[in-house]
Amino acid sequence: MTGLRMHAAYFNISPRIKAGEAVQQDVHGIDGRGEVILDFDKDGKLLGVEILGAKSLLRPSTLKQAKRIG
């Protein structure tokens, strides 16, 4: 997904993800509206979920509760 403004969201499944710990990503495109990326560790355990195009894929109430970073 490309564009000047990409709205992203990240949901941690694991309480703390160390740099380099996510070694496998499974990317799912969603009808040209965005992507959902699952991050896994070396043992295949799910660490977190990244959503690109979050404004298109998440409910406004979910975005409103999100912690803003960056």
Task: Name each region found by the language model.
Residues 56-68:
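A short, polar/charged loop-to-alpha-helix boundary motif
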Residues 1-2:
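Short amphipathic beta-strand and strand-loop transition segments with alternating hydrophobic
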